[in-house]
Amino acid sequence: MIARKRKSNGSETTSGKIPKDDVSSESCLDQPADESVHEVVTFEPSTLPSVHYDPDTTEPISCSLKSLDELLSWKRNEASIFNVSSVPLASRYPPLESCPRRTLVSHDMMGGYLEDRFIQGAEVETPYAFYHWEYIDIFNYFSHQMVTIPPAVWTNAAHRHGVLSIGTFITEWTDGAKTCEAFLADEESYRAAADKLVQISHCNGFDGWLINIENELSETAVNNTGPFLRYLTDQMHERVPGSVVIWYDSVLKDGKLLWQNELNDNNRMFFDACDGFFTNYNWTEQSLEGMKSYAAAQGRFADIYVGVDVFARGKVIGGKYETNKALELIRKYDLSTAIFAPDWVYECHEKADFRQNQDKFWSLLSDFLYIHRPSSNLPFVSSFCQGFGKSLYWRGKVETERSWFNLHAQEIQPLYLSESFGNGGWLRTRGCSEDAWIGGSSLMLEGMIPSGLSDVCARIFSLHVPLAARTFVSFVFKPPVGVKVSLELKTIDGPLCTFDGTEEIASRSVFPEALAESNQLVEQFAQNCGQWASDGWATRCFLLKMIGCSLREVCIRVSRDGGDEDINFNCRIGEIMLLDADNLQAPLQSVEGICVNDVVWQTGVLKGDGHTLKVLLNATLRWQYPTRQVRHFRIHWRHLRGPDPRIPSGPLTLIGRSYSALYRVVELEVPAAPGLIELVVEPVSKEGFSVPEAQWGRQTLSYSQSPSGNPSH
């Protein structure tokens, strides 16, 4: 994940689990791994498909499909092996089907496929990222290309938080009308198009489609639109359980293009054929009243997503920093909402103030949004990384010193809240990239404890995690001056864990006491981690003994350390981790089956001697390893032997990080041919425990000059 800087030119060009039924000729995981791979260095142009690999660097990229021909000719064995979600959809409370008022976010930003198209990350000073996942149910990646396939970085981030990720199928203008006349001509045609949409969603690991037909339809086409939607919806449900198909308010039952800004008799046929209806943005309170009393909507209010354009284009209610006014009205009528283009906080403001503006925007909406609880078994781990930063950290040390952006790296996000108390007291949590424990950011907890108040408490996680009989807790932070910091955990008993999540349940607070550093569990944990503290970071460990309980909230309590005057504080939180205390040494598997393919050799700029060109290696590494056991993989390389036998073997050097069992080595400078290098894959466990080198994966690559002796061309 060591990123390269890319221009935001808006060009489109499709991250990565490998489907079980993938029979692509690129796959070599089922073949015996050679002890060494040999390559002949030839500087020929790359033959990799430019829609999936950057033509200049061969970096893997995400892309859309621009035409009906591209859709109908799509084949699984020609699809990108990188643009595939590697994170399964997490459970959460309340489940989507139980949530009476849902929130969809439609991400429409400057045409789409910007820095986020680089699947292994990009070097970006001030990127846009979404991290208020606790508030939303569905994430839609939107562009004006015909078939918008969500970049896997977004799907992974959404899935990690239990949020659905859906793509967009859109037709517009004259060309769109021609497309519709073709694929809606008859049953065979619309089924062929729907089948491809289902296959693409299944292959890439996302969860459905927004269907947006913004052109007029002939009588034949509109009569086939309902059956098309119904067939697509049924097939999606069968192939991708939990998926959704949502219709955008556009054409009417007679084929005319006339936005209604509500669900009514003119567009009901489309609503009846799929999972939801996304209204246009120019609605009024009268529109909401009408939908609330509309017979066809009864029992399906949650499936009506009232559109809100954050840019406030046209005659709309709310928008911008008054979007909360629109949500207040929508929730008054018990309807769901679709928030369109919340990247307004990024596009229309100073990029350096992005975090502050995004937190302000979602804070204003928070009274009208559910907080969803991601649900998982132990271990639960978060370092608060938002998927970007000024440097890349590992255990408080800078691993890569440059700006980067990669949503694959985003971890479970905390609640970003702001509260005020009497006498001027306040409390806020925010992400901060100035320092981090792991990843690119830490959680800043800051505020003022006013005179007369002994402490303040910040809720940083709402979740649902069944605890072990003995649960080990690790808490990494930088101790602040003048105040004391402690953990408060809220739990519920096991019998209460079967509810559907829509009602509040009384919890009890647990205030664990820190274990001594001499405690056997603490010593074992420290030994597994390989490093105890760094650059002012402190680690506190706790042991919970609770049978049949689940964790519901993680809170941090800040109390004054003597005195009664107003006291300002700021505390940096690096990581919170909960583990089964009886499995602190769970054995990890070895990386197996490393293979190297799709090798491309390039020449770089002249070296310092003025006449020798740099030799650059580009190659895809694939291996076998259960990715659910790891936080990420570190990819290393070292020089073993070159043309000059007097030069000894080199040390291992980090190339980057991978978040799946797949990595593209890009522009790696290696010694001139003939040479021998070693490529190494190091698994990093979710807990951050050190993995013995004997379990790392290794593959040697030898290379020689072409027989002509001229490696240039």
Swiss-Prot record:
EC number(s) recorded for this UniProt protein: 3.2.1.96
Gene3D superfamilies of this UniProt entry? Galactose-binding domain-like, Glycosidases
- Cross-referenced CDD domains: GH85_ENGase (cd06547)
Localization (cell): Cytoplasm, Cytosol
Region labeled Disordered — which residues? 1-36
Write out the entry's keywords from A to Z: Cytoplasm, Glycosidase, Hydrolase
Q: What class of enzyme is it?
A: hydrolase
Reactions this protein catalyses: an N(4)-(oligosaccharide-(1->3)-[oligosaccharide-(1->6)]-beta-D-Man-(1->4)-beta-D-GlcNAc-(1->4)-alpha-D-GlcNAc)-L-asparaginyl-[protein] + H2O = an oligosaccharide-(1->3)-[oligosaccharide-(1->6)]-beta-D-Man-(1->4)-D-GlcNAc + N(4)-(N-acetyl-beta-D-glucosaminyl)-L-asparaginyl-[protein]
All residue ranges annotated as the BRCT domain in the record: 270-362
Give an example GO molecular function.
mannosyl-glycoprotein endo-beta-N-acetylglucosaminidase activity
Q: Which GO terms describe its cellular component?
A: cytosol
Q: Any keyword Endoplasmic reticulum? A: no
Q: Which InterPro entries match?
A: ENGase, Glyco_hydro_85
Keyword Ion transport listed? The answer is no
- Swiss-Prot/TrEMBL GO biological process terms: N-glycan processing
What does the protein in this record do?
Answer: Endoglycosidase that releases N-glycans from glycoproteins by cleaving the beta-1,4-glycosidic bond in the N,N'-diacetylchitobiose core. Involved in the processing of free oligosaccharides in the cytosol.
Q: Which family does the record assign?
A: Belongs to the glycosyl hydrolase 85 family.
Q: Which PANTHER family does this one have? A: CYTOSOLIC ENDO-BETA-N-ACETYLGLUCOSAMINIDASE (PTHR13246:SF1), ENDO BETA N-ACETYLGLUCOSAMINIDASE (PTHR13246)
**Name of the protein described by the UniProt record:** Cytosolic endo-beta-N-acetylglucosaminidase
Gene, per the UniProt record: engase
